[in-house]
Amino acid sequence: MTDDFYCDEALSGRTKVTVVMETEDVLAFEHTRPFWPVHIVVVPKRHVPSLVDLGEASEDLLYRVIEVVRQVAAEVEREHGACRVLTNLGRYQDSKHPHFHVCSGPLTSPGPGAMADRNQSTSRREGP
């Protein structure tokens, strides 16, 4: 097992996911442990470690991923009135595979990246 949930579990079929949209190169599915009432994850089917590497690996693939993010986000916004599109890099990125979260509604369960952000925000408010 690697630190890539998407290749190891979601894309391999080992973990069942509810598909929202799929193209030849991109999969969008409902998050298996959602942090928001609406929480969809968009991933390229080809493995690359992060968003930074995705651009270097293939600008066309990056465009195709963003196009699916755009379509999913438009649908979520239409249905729910608003949405967020989020991604994480570095230590905030739990799974070393580029992925975008398309979310709507109040945060119901903070993930590791959310906790890191909250801790940084708190320390900034407290001052040096």
Predicted regions and their residues:
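HIT superfamily nucleotide-processing domains
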Residues: 1-128
